[in-house]
């Protein structure tokens, strides 16, 4: 089941499709492997924990509406647009191990769509 993920302002910005992260047009932008998030170029870029995506500094980037993971605060969420058709998934590259994870921090200063698309 696909769901919108919200940024620190409560705006829906990316889509979680159950195994990966997609842009608002339904195109794949990041892999999720266990609790790790990888770019399409197989670089470790963050963590996925209890419905929250954290950046490489372990700062909250986006979250699902039913997330139970650590958030600095839960913003009011705006309405969500309809979900687009989802594109096919290309072959997944070999993914390297993940670095050590720092302690939880605040909200990320990164723009979620830009950060996850790199």
Placement of each model-derived feature along the sequence:
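Well-ordered beta-strand segments characteristic of repetitive beta-sheet solenoids
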Residues: 5, 20-22, 36-38, 53-54
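Long terminal segments
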Residues: 1-11, 50-118
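N-terminal leader/targeting segments and the first structural element of proteins
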Residues: 1-30
